[in-house]
């Protein structure tokens, strides 16, 4: 139990100790036996006044709740400890649980199961990170695309090649546990207190490796290059999963297959697993010089060694549709993220230092199921494929279509680059970046860029770059589950994470993975 002193606003260049001193001053708790620590810090660059905003935890040897009530200060509150209750069932599990997919959701599901003695079997269609790095690098240098091992598939999932953002809006108490587990396996210790924590692809990969080793150390098994090909269901209940040409008997399987496992979606649907279409988004990647974003958001303080590379979050709604920035990568690169042949797909990635020349983010436009309804659950998948194939046809290769913002706004193709150089690793073809998108998405992007330029000075500058398409922001389907977390149509299957339509980002996927593990643990003994 603790006292929380929130909203402590100080000049950005003061050390953390100044926030602790201010918390002590505000509460009058200056005695040496009062322990204090910063538990949250963020940067506020609004209105041209750059501040760090702190929350400080104070642990006192008396009734902290009564003290907070007596103070009657809105910025001082009592925070009881949140105890996570680990469930333990009594039924006997005949076969070890199976976890399909080793992205954030599957990784955390398997980790929790292994740490509590359930010896999970993990099936991952891609390779381990060592192999994956080699395969991805070879593709980016002009080699063949491996449709089972790429940016989307393999150990760590799509999140392993991202900015490693750990922000979420779900407010689940398990979020703290996720951060603690990541920090215990090599993530920077400060992720537990930053309001916008990130790890970076370089560090995150090592964290994933360490967690996988811990799974194996605790009795789990991980099989790479082993895609799920189907499930066996008897009387509405799971009895086996199919992989590697064999039936693997199991009563419980966590399906954390990722948002790009389109062939697996189709196979599971054919086995009777229920799917429904859901909203998602499509768009392009936008790149600016990071120094220009810093100047726009930090003003004269841009470049100060105590300020991180600036990041942003933009959104606009009009005519029942949204356009928003997504997965912003300060000092990052645009990456080739396709998982099917003869397609072009972009995504964003950055390293922990975020010290690249460009800033990039997706500019995504919302897509509603009514935009693509074809009478099946997979109309959104079909739309994604049409966009990705159209981009490939446009360039004639895995190179991505690219266009300056000024040319896009003026409705003309780009012939020559300006100050911003594209970072897409395979190379780009200058022309029209958004021509592969539906008309409504092109219109929304064209109308939103000037609006965003009024929010961040220079955002719609003529030399900024658009590279497309961005189609994998989230899953276009949901593997619908009931209150018991089982998938409709098959008791024993637990759809999980982004691919199931129940998460968006590393943190929420990891939390969903833990919840899936708890669902098994509350029913069965280890």
Predicted regions and their residues:
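Residues forming the flavin
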Residues: 1-52, 56-185, 189-526
